[in-house]
Amino acid sequence: MARLKEIYRNEIAPKLKEELKLSNVMEVPRVTKITLNMGLGEAIGDKKVIEHAVADLEKITGQKPVVTFARKSIAGFKVREGWPIGVKVTLRSDKMYEFLDRLLAISLPRVRDFRGLNAKSFDGRGNYSMGVKEQIIFPEIDYDKIDALRGLDITLTTTARSDDEGRALLRAFKFPFRN
């Protein structure tokens, strides 16, 4: 079992149940999935960009990403319907907790000029989104073998009913919020 999953079950869940004054342990908010998305506008001109992004996300997550396609044509962006424009991965269960552990312990401390995560990036329903400017913060990516620096979006979907519950959950996981 993943280290963070055990910590959640044995320490975080009972503490949150008491803190949020919940009657049942099943009401305690938990992380249900983590979605990593890489939007690749530059893939329009070069098809190799998608292959490199797929390889990078696969190294980071240990899971094969899904290529996303444009839903409709947009002349301003020179995009046609059906063209590949991004890659995404959805992590659940043990892989999700292992990724979260690596993100908090290894990757975030490697971000240049890191002052903490924005505590206001919740969506109103307890889900948290953050952006990473470069994929090289992950130790699985070899700096010498990348073709370009690419950012990615990380979304943590929780069962929390409000932003305050979601914030309490992520603070219990020791998320480094700045404010």
From Swiss-Prot:
PROSITE patterns, per database record: RIBOSOMAL_L5 (PS00358)
Gene Ontology MF terms in the entry: rRNA binding; structural constituent of ribosome; tRNA binding
Keywords, ordered alphabetically: Ribonucleoprotein, Ribosomal protein, RNA-binding, rRNA-binding, tRNA-binding
Any single biological process term in GO: translation
Annotated GO CC locations: ribonucleoprotein complex; ribosome
rRNA-binding found in the keyword field: yes
Organism superkingdom: Bacteria
Stated family: Belongs to the universal ribosomal protein uL5 family.
NCBIfam families noted in UniProt: PRK00010.1
HAMAP family for the chain: Ribosomal_uL5_B
Subunit structure: Part of the 50S ribosomal subunit; part of the 5S rRNA/L5/L18/L25 subcomplex. Contacts the 5S rRNA and the P site tRNA. Forms a bridge to the 30S subunit in the 70S ribosome.
Function: This is one of the proteins that bind and probably mediate the attachment of the 5S RNA into the large ribosomal subunit, where it forms part of the central protuberance. In the 70S ribosome it contacts protein S13 of the 30S subunit (bridge B1b), connecting the 2 subunits; this bridge is implicated in subunit movement. Contacts the P site tRNA; the 5S rRNA and some of its associated proteins might help stabilize positioning of ribosome-bound tRNAs.
Protein name: Large ribosomal subunit protein uL5
Organism of derivation: Pseudomonas putida (strain ATCC 47054 / DSM 6125 / CFBP 8728 / NCIMB 11950 / KT2440)
Lineage of source species: Bacteria, Pseudomonadati, Pseudomonadota, Gammaproteobacteria, Pseudomonadales
